Amino acid sequence: MEWSDEGIILGVRRHGEAGAIVELLTRGHGRHLGLVRGGASSRLRPLLQPGNSVLAVWRARLDEHLGYYQLEGTRMRAATMLASSHAVYGITHLASLARLLPERDPHEDIYEMLERTLDDFDDVGDAATHLIRFELAMLAELGFGLDLSACAATGATTDLIYVSPKSGGAVSRTAGEPWREKLLRLPDFLREDNDGRNGWSDQDLRDGFDLTGRFLLRNVLEPRGQGHSDARDGFINAVAKHLARAAIV
């Protein structure tokens, strides 16, 4: 058995004295593990870092075997990402989200979104909005997508500023006003009628993480006996600290 594919490194763990088991999210073969001979060596250490993109060749005698990877770096992001705390927490959290997908099950849209998210991780605000969008995409991919296109109560497609914590549907300002204390806020940058000119605010980011966090916890994590990763909390705190420092300056 042999195939080649694009992949993003999610995690690496040592195997034996010199090898390493590398976990990739690949474009066409999903989340897939393989053994890299000599993967624990100093020569391969810069390559085998979470967040790096690679061209992977996988070989095994049978399809169900772990198999062996031969990897070639195509986008080496890790060195830059390791220099900022938000990026370190971010890639760790993104990897934990990707692990919610079944192994060896292709999810090309998620792969492409992860690629774009990592490419924009230099800017803290962009990283946060991309990560919130990635969490929304994961909810949809796992069968729990939110309908933010129209008001769940009236069908209106404009002035959507709330989300129902029960249905996951958007709610307009007028329809939601009587119950605003019980509704979740829909960040401006997630509104479909936002053409991008309005940007985002610190409150938008808090609302966004609250929104995706609640549905991930209730619909995906708690049924699996899990909670939010420490890396998610670390990312949110790192973003908040960075924005607070920027506001002072």
Swiss-Prot record:
Which Gene Ontology BP annotations are present?
A: DNA recombination; double-strand break repair
Reply yes or no: does the keyword DNA damage apply: yes
GO cellular component labels = bacterial nucleoid
Q: Does the keyword DNA damage apply?
A: yes
InterPro entries per the UniProt record, alphabetical:
ARFGAP/RecO, DNA_rep/recomb_RecO_N, NA-bd_OB-fold, RecO, RecO_C
Keyword annotations from UniProtKB, A to Z: DNA damage, DNA recombination, DNA repair
| Entries under PANTHER family matching the protein | DNA REPAIR PROTEIN RECO
Q: What is known about what this protein does?
A: Involved in DNA repair and RecF pathway recombination.
Homology family: Belongs to the RecO family.
Q: What is this protein called?
A: DNA repair protein RecO
Species assigned in the record: Rhodopseudomonas palustris (strain HaA2)
Source taxonomy lineage?
Bacteria, Pseudomonadati, Pseudomonadota, Alphaproteobacteria, Hyphomicrobiales
